[in-house]
């Protein structure tokens, strides 16, 4: 196995512990490896958790289980299918690309790197995302997000493109309780959002040219990953956007220290 640049693992009927031990064994024996391909993945959890290797790509064919890429710092994970709950949980750096949809709490507590989901995400996606100095996590959702998107968000960027698999508009966003408890970062949704769709502590802010320049590179990267045509990319960049941001940095402060507010 030493000296190999690519290794293929057939994960059919393999327990998640066995699969993850196999991945770490490969990395120990061949630290210069560039690509690991996992085939017949079906619900195995914790894939690539804690791996710190910037020049590694992990391609997954199938449906990985929960906490994909948790605590990961560096690798690129490409999922040719859907993913279960919490991909990118507390991820520090790297990229996760999901060609299908993902489950609840996608990008939970993410603190760096990028997650691109071509389809939809489940409830409470982006919960507790946080940023520090140059560490700015980014979650880009191609389709729709269920309720409580960006709950208790402390930093980072969430972008919702609101398009189907062909790049057509999905209509008005229906998610509720968006940004509940948000106290940092910003959520950008293509299309209009009503005030009654917002959660406590969230507010609709003016979308500026500076905001467009901020999200433009991530939209372009999304289009590149998923091979979207130029006309779809241009439509996304020239659409009406809604920016959702915190009312304040301490939205619940007066509940605990009213004398300091």
UniProtKB/Swiss-Prot annotation:
Molecular function via GO: oxidoreductase activity
SUPFAM superfamilies: Alpha subunit of glutamate synthase, C-terminal domain
One Pfam family, short name: GXGXG
Alphabetical list of InterPro entries matching this protein: Archaeal_gltB, Glu_synth_asu_C, Glu_synth_asu_C_sf, Glu_synth_lsu_3
Family to which the UniProt record says this protein belongs: Belongs to the FwdC/FmdC family.
The protein's name: Uncharacterized protein MJ1350
Organism: Methanocaldococcus jannaschii (strain ATCC 43067 / DSM 2661 / JAL-1 / JCM 10045 / NBRC 100440)
